[in-house]
């Protein structure tokens, strides 16, 4: 039961964090390109690499905390569904370059983010 509670609490925090961060990015950069979604997904990719690698290398992180952070917080913070919707809308609006850029940038930057998180955890 503590694992489910950890996932729920961390998930709620992740959702609010995504709302605030993405909203802030959109306020600065506008909505012509899905910068807010890209930002939260890249940050989330970095954090999953950091957390999972750190969890593999130490016994200091309990299973409840690891699952709360990864499934809960990062599950609420990152958003593949919004990425998909925003990319579809770009395609529907004839913004083929922006849609392609969003797909390529999301995949490439998220992979680099995950790698950077893993490398950072290995330095701890």
UniProtKB/Swiss-Prot annotation:
Question: What reaction is this protein's catalytic activity?
Answer: fluoride(in) = fluoride(out)
Which terms in the Gene Ontology molecular function aspect does this entry carry? fluoride channel activity; fluoride transmembrane transporter activity; metal ion binding
Please name the NCBIfam families in this protein's record: crcB (TIGR00494)
Organism, by scientific name, is Geobacter sulfurreducens (strain ATCC 51573 / DSM 12127 / PCA)
Q: Which domain of life is it from?
A: Bacteria
Provide GO CC annotations from the record: plasma membrane
Record Pfam families: CRCB
Its protein name is Fluoride-specific ion channel FluC
User: Which UniProt keyword terms apply here?
Assistant: Cell inner membrane, Cell membrane, Ion channel, Ion transport, Membrane, Metal-binding, Sodium, Transmembrane, Transmembrane helix, Transport
Q: Where does Na(+) bind?
A: 75, 78
Q: What is its membrane topology? A: Multi-pass membrane protein
